[in-house]
Amino acid sequence: SALSSCNDGYKTNAHSDLIVQRLTCSAEENKGDLFLCHEKSFVNGLQRSADYSHTGNYSCKTNKSAPYAFTVEFRNVKKGELIHAEIWFKSAKPSKVGNVIISDNKTVQYDSNCFTAKTEGEWTLMTNTFKAIKDYDVVKVYGLNSTNSDIYFDDASIVRMSSTPKPPVTDSTLRIYIPPHQFSLLDSFLTEGRKEMILRKEFKKYVKGFILQKGDSTPVKLRLKGDWTDHLKTDKYSLRIKTSGNNAYNGLKSFSIQNPETRGMMLEWYIHQICAEEDLLTTRYDFVNVEINGEIKGAYALEEHFDKQLLEARNRREGPIVKLDEEGLWQLNYDLETKPRKVLSPAFMSSTILPFKKNRTHKSATLHEQFLVAQSNLNKYKNLESDPNNYVNLEAFAKYIAILDLGNVDHAQAWHNQRQYYNPVTAKLEPILYDCFQDKQHITGRRLFYLVDEVLTERRPTNLNLALLRDVNFRDFYLSYIQKLGSVDYIKNFNENNAAKIQSNLDLLAYEYPFYQAQVDLDFFEKSARAMESEKDSLLTFMKDFKEVTFVKDVWQKFPDTLDYFRPAIALKAHLENEEGGMKKISLRNFHQSDISVKAYSTDSLPDQLILLDSSVDFTGFTSDYETKHLFLPSDVKYVYYVPKNLGGKLIREKISKWPLPDNIDVRGDFSSVLNQYKKKGIITIPKGTYSFTKNVVATDAEKLIIEAGSSIDLTNTAGFISYIPVEIKGTPKNPVHIFSSDSTGSGFNVFSEHGHSILENTHFTGLNSMNKNHWILTGAVTLYGGSVAIANCSFNDNQCEDGLNIIRSKFTMTESTVSNTLSDGFDADFCTGVLSNSVITLTKNDALDFSGSQIEIIGCEISKAGDKGISGGENSQLKISNTSINGAVIGIASKDYSQLEVTDVRLKNCDYTYAAFRKKPEYGPASITVTSSSEQVKGRMLLDLDSKITIGSKVSVGKEKLDIESLYSNQ
């Protein structure tokens, strides 16, 4: 077992001093309608039956006409009291289950549980725990049969506790302070949300507060978080928290905290941990003790929000995170809950594609360009377009869905819960797993395909996985991950490797949740793995027989003029397409199910003045197909105004989106298929010769690409070389390979191979630019992504872009090579492990060597004439540098953002600063450099930031004040 302290004795005895009542009752004795027990009588004695029993001779029989069992009341239940109930049941039909209910008489608090805690033969133990959120006159506990079949209940056991203790405040406690006037505002939102039974957008406004840590106060903004009242119903309400300015909390700029019960206690943590080990993007997720305004709230689940820190922590380069806007869905759900007439609307079809961090994305030219491709890709995914390998990372999605299958999760696969990261290097979407609500009761082992079966039956295109299933490569990837994850050995190894983390979490949860069935939750994953194992054959059959499906087009009911329903997010959509000659082109689409007429607009300069259009733009009520119309309006236009026919002349304002409608972008552009002629037996071999390409060349659908010694490849007219398979270039000293751009426009030599091994020997890359067209922006003249690569006796010269050589997410060796005369950095490696030896880097306008999030050894290298840093390690890099010389740099060796550099036998000359250690990004900690070779110590100025450390021999220097690093740079 992964647990050491969550056994029965622990649960019942740990808080024995707080137990005020303990009841047990079987069906052995009754008097009239009462079951007679030692402590207290239970109702429903007339239903005593000798048909079956868990113990003894009798049980309580329930059916449709007599659905209750072992009913008992508790009076004067005070806020904070805990009632825990356990009841055994046996069903006449295995698919029918009993519930154990604990509730007040007014359904202010109604806790229902039908999850299995234990089984003994045909009997199942159900448990439920109720923690009073207010004072109650009466609380009832009972077994409930909500089916049409007979269900037998027996052996009820109930514990009532006066309270549960809170964890003690420690250095790791998240301590929040919200000023009184701000807390009052938050409380008003909480009250209104509870009244309406849904947390609408109006109740999610931010208030100001502080996080108190280590004697400092970090300013933050907070708001209520969640959609339904499960996030609000207890005193442990959910919050979204954003740190302000140049601050972070434990490496996080924004995050959420929520009651662990809303996230399945340990279940969701377990899935997040598997994702981390499988290199799948997911939010960082943990448990933390929380204090708000001096009151200990107890254990919360803390989950990272969708910031660039999420990506960098998982070894991804910053890129847009996108989603389908779900506001229309919640407006629809609110109407369905509160209005008498249930009329559906096209929430999915009308959903707009949005980035997280809208302002940052809009202001950054690079992020804006990347978003346009991300938007195009997500629109293709939304519309189930063919060839998904062109717009999503198929392997990542296969892994994502297999992990969700292991967790028996379908909630995260709903369209409105999906979040995608646009990888700016591969130009494809990757899924981000979060919000993993599990179905513990119905373990199937293949949730994906049951969900798809439902969609195929209805033939409605709302299950986005169908786009993936069309691709045979996805199906192969998916089956391989089912094979890996659907293994009991995999789960057992995971439990062993994470035993310490699991126990630490359980120790925190045990304070407030003494009856939490932790082992049941952990055993759940082993059961799910077994289910996956048992259904592998049916998966093979399903994939083999999978065929295309023709979808039924949804037809939506048009609103009668008398029906004043209006859902603003499922109505008029206005998008800024472009700006030219002082006028903006605005695209308009209508999804409101009534005729509308666009009448006017307003501008930033005259926000209170409506300017009438020369003629209105009219749309008929939406039923199945939208049409797009356009307006040309002044450059400072901000809103358009329209009148829905069914609202009696009411004028509605719609803000114009900063983002255009999705375009159909293929980043590869018009590419040549010339390499197909060189394909034989799964290998593409370019024979020795001279080649000139004027449009992109793409190598794919093969085992590997070989370029023979003596070949010469000229990339002109912005042509780029793109390979999605490993590359093998084995030039010789007498017959090297030349890859160059005679007109300096060639869009780089780019290799994307997630798992393969590439070899570059005796190859000269000269005069290349980087890929920068069709909104695809790379930084390297040579870009190598994923897998592993061995580079020997190569040169990277005269590049026309940011990096001479850029290696990303790869394991590499590079020896006897040269990087020279670069426009910016010489060699840039991100999220790599590697060894660089006996190489020369010279004449770089910026850093000679720049490593981020990497573990690198640098041995016997010569660096000269660097425009900024000779060697730079950042974002938690670990560098070992030995027998290396740096002659000419602003900073010889720099360690940034929690990086650790070990330096031995290094010669520094002509450097303005010998060493620098500093923190540049708030989510990281201080940096350090340790110089151990005393014979080669160099005296000179150093840059040392607050709490960063430089050790030279036995002398340790620690920064005492915060440096203005940007200012120091600007003064060079």
Model-derived regions, located:
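Phosphate/dinucleotide-binding and metal-coordinating scaffold of catalytic cores
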Residues: C6-T12, S163-G649
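Sec-dependent bacterial lipoprotein signal peptides
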Residues: S1-L3
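Extracellular beta-rich repeat passengers
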Residues: K93-S95, D614-D636, Y641-V643, L647-A709, ...
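Short edge-strand/loop segments of extracellular domains
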Residues: I102-Q109, Y422-T426, I725-T732
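Short, solvent-exposed aromatic-acidic interface loops
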Residues: S146-T147, L224-W228, D435-D439, S741-T745, ...
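Extracellular and organelle-lumenal recognition/adhesion modules and their flexible linkers in secreted
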Residues: C6-T164
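Short strand-coil-strand connectors
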Residues: N105, K214-D216, N293-E295, P687, ...
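Short, surface-exposed charged micro-motifs
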Residues: T129, K221, N289, R419-Y421, ...
